Amino acid sequence: MRLLVLLWGCLLLPGYEALEGPEEISGFEGDTVSLQCTYREELRDHRKYWCRKGGILFSRCSGTIYAEEEGQETMKGRVSIRDSRQELSLIVTLWNLTLQDAGEYWCGVEKRGPDESLLISLFVFPGPCCPPSPSPTFQPLATTRLQPKAKAQQTQPPGLTSPGLYPAATTAKQGKTGAEAPPLPGTSQYGHERTSQYTGTSPHPATSPPAGSSRPPMQLDSTSAEDTSPALSSGSSKPRVSIPMVRILAPVLVLLSLLSAAGLIAFCSHLLLWRKEAQQATETQRNEKFCLSRLTAEEKEAPSQAPEGDVISMPPLHTSEEELGFSKFVSA
């Protein structure tokens, strides 16, 4: 168990704080956003890249862009990438965002073994490409007619009237030395006047924002995009540390392989032990058969040799003289 814990730690610790950067970046449709991924000193000379995350079951890169040498900017479509090795950072800029650009991207560094990578989410909000231009339409409420030998003044649009008063119009100069008519109360003496039929309302309600809420138009040019976009992207994001999915799944795969190897070793040892016991059993049976056949052969040979071998030599009898005399008397 301790060995597995050490192995797990060895697999996870090498990728810790290898890459740092924003977790999320966002922008409106048509904007330009820029982000910065910082890496460690030992990854200075390694190759950096930017790609979009794809795949369903297994993650893969699509549309990969590799950074060139020190300070050189590489562009592919609407994406540019630059490796600043002095600052240990990889700068990525996305131009003219579209709704299809929203998704997850990898900021990665190639190295021996699994690559160091950082997952970044891009959010694109719909918005107009340019601010709405006002198109005022003026409708004069009064007209003037020209008098003979008189310079008529151009008809001016109605002026702004006080709340609750009717709109008023200025009259033309009549005659060569005619006196100018005094302005009516509530009217303005300047040209290009506007009128409002209701108090507190705007002459263009379609283009005026509602009370209490206003959204300034956003315009980003090519010179100020790099300065304003990092502030926009970094305002709602914070640096984080990303651990690749491969490093998370690697300990599980190693554990499964160790368990399968242990099971295979136990099965093989059990199989060898069973085979050894079977061999010993066969040898024991073979020895028993051999001993039994030998005993039967010896038993068969024993009766044929028994009459000759069973003769017992008796020692000679010593008879006394009395017994000899008695035997002679009986025989006589």
From Swiss-Prot:
Signal peptide range in chain numbering: 1-18
Glycosylation sites: 96, 137, 143-144, 155, 161, 170-171, 177, 187, 195-196, 199, 201-202, 207-208, 213-214, 222-224, 228-229, 237
Domain notes: Ig-like V-type domain mediates binding to lymphocyte.
Molecular function terms from GO: transmembrane signaling receptor activity
Its biological purpose: Receptor which may mediate L-selectin-dependent lymphocyte rollings. Binds SELL in a calcium dependent manner. Binds lymphocyte.
Tissue expression from the record: Highly expressed in heart, skeletal muscle and placenta.
Cell wall biogenesis/degradation recorded as keyword: no
Ranges of Polar residues composition bias in the record: 186-205, 220-239
Keyword Transport: no
Main location: membrane
PANTHER family in UniProt: CMRF35-LIKE MOLECULE 9, POLYMERIC-IMMUNOGLOBULIN RECEPTOR
Pfam family, one: V-set
Protein's organism: Homo sapiens (Human)
Listed name of the protein: CMRF35-like molecule 9
Subcellular location: Apical cell membrane; Basolateral cell membrane; Endosome, Multivesicular body membrane
Residue stretches of biased makeup (Low complexity): 147-158, 168-181
InterPro entries recorded: CD300_family_receptors, Ig-like_dom, Ig-like_dom_sf, Ig-like_fold, Ig_sub, Ig_V-set
BP GO annotations: immune system process; signal transduction
Regions of this protein lying in the Extracellular compartment: 19-247
Gene name of the encoded protein: CD300LG
UniProt modification remark: O-glycosylated with sialylated oligosaccharides.
The family this protein is said to belong to: Belongs to the CD300 family.
Cytoplasmic side: 269-332
